[in-house]
Amino acid sequence: MHVSAYTNWAGAYSTKGDLLVVSSLSPNNKGLYGLETVFHEGMHQWDLQVFEALRQQAIKLNKFFPRGLSHGLVFFTAGEAIRRVVPGHVPQADMIGVWQRGLRQFKVPLEEIWKPYLDGRGTRHEAFAELIKRTAVEPPTKE
């Protein structure tokens, strides 16, 4: 992990080589949000595996994997991890309006399906299957 004054517009990023870069000057990384950001970016190291597991569930239903779901999982999981340690913590996704900017359709399914998995109920496979059932989109019709 590298800490730098400037990273990018988001204040942090990760690459496919186990590199995490976090801005020390971004207001979104102050206090507990810095820890949440590190956790968030660290989770991106498994993007390919998570994407493939979700995609396989979508294939079983003959549907398309919904764009944005895997990033919603990352935001939600990182926020939940911090909230469990510090009750009352407002997750970064809520603080910066992530759910209002393109990931709105995932918040309720994540709360109803993914959070119970994080609480120890069910398996990841079952949670992914339910998330895809709730959020996947129909393939385009061939004309």
Question: What is each residue range found by the language model?
Answer:
Residues E36-Q49:
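Active-site recognition of the HExxH zinc-binding catalytic motif
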Residues M1-S14:
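Auxiliary, metal-adjacent structural segments of Zn-dependent hydrolase domains
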Residues V90-E143:
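Pan-zinc metallopeptidase signature
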Residues V21-V38:
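Short pre-active-site segment immediately N-terminal to the catalytic Zn-binding motif
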Residues V50-F51, A58-P109:
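Post-HExxH zinc-binding segment in Zn-dependent metallohydrolases
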Residues G11, T15-D18, H71:
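Mature, well-folded catalytic/scaffold domains that follow N-terminal targeting or propeptide regions
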Residues T15-V22, W46-K60:
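Flexible internal linker/loop segments at domain or repeat junctions
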